[in-house]
Amino acid sequence: MLFLDDAKMKNFTSCFKEKDFLKFFFNRLRLNKTSRYESEFPYISLCGRERNFIRCDDTPVVFTEQLRKDDTEVLSYAHAGQVLTLPYEPHKLYMDPRNGRVYHPAAPQVGGIGLVRSKLAIELSQHFEFLAGEASPTHFQWNGERLELQNEWVNNTQRFPMNEDCK
């Protein structure tokens, strides 16, 4: 969910929900390489002359639901439904063994990684297989196929979480 930084109450009633705005905002989201506020705000969304500096607990992209779009499976992010989606790559789901969070590839301009919302991660976790003990899962059962998880992509991502539990 997207909030103003100084919002006192951060819940669904106080977040931005207008899908056209979310599309505009997230399509301009990038790593902050402006030399301004980089340590406090590692992401930026340039909206015309306005600079929106962004910080987040974990990743700026949070996948909120799994959908079908034009006969293709996609993950939607930012609670924007069909407006903001990326192709679903089930073989690239990654569960971090340190915190149990599930991640999926995102656009390179935001660091290449997005967090899977807890509710969706719980649904997906039913399909994980752990052949290496309690470490990250090694396989994923999806649509009748047993997929070997490919987690190498995580090594090439950038995350700047503000929450210590997410590091």
Swiss-Prot record:
Pfam families: DUF4505. GO terms for cellular component: mitochondrion. One of its GO terms (biological process) is wound healing. Belongs to the UPF0598 family. This is UPF0598 protein CG30010. The lineage of its organism: Eukaryota, Metazoa, Ecdysozoa, Arthropoda, Hexapoda.
